[in-house]
């Protein structure tokens, strides 16, 4: 995802790689924190990957930071309310129907 983010932002050097990787890891931890299944975080499908990239862009793209931050929150909420994405054993606030308490 690092190279994809750099391409989106037109970054053609490695000066920000460490920071971008930090944000990538933070996004994964944030999704894990709401109970997203580990396998989808480790090997993301297009919805999870898009959420992770949007999270990073909310920090990297200063001009559009608020837009990306709001988009990430919406994407995260959709993932959190989709039962296939939730690890019920890791999220005690989700009942058997996938509904948050």
Report each predicted region and the residues it spans:
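Conserved short "hinge" loops at termini or chain/domain junctions
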Residues: 1-48, 84-101
């Amino acid at each position: 995802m690092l190279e994809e983010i750099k391409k989106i932002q037109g970054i053609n050097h490695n000066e920000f790689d460490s920071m971008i990787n930090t944000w990538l890891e933070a996004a994964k931890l944030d999704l894990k924190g709401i109970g997203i299944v580990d396998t989808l975080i480790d090997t993301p499908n297009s919805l999870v990957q898009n959420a992770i990239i949007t999270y990073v862009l909310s920090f990297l793209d200063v001009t559009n930071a608020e837009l990306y931050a709001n988009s990430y929150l919406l994407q995260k909420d959709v993932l959190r309310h989709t039962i296939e994405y939730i690890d019920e054993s890791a999220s005690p606030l989700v009942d058997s129907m996938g509904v948050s308490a």
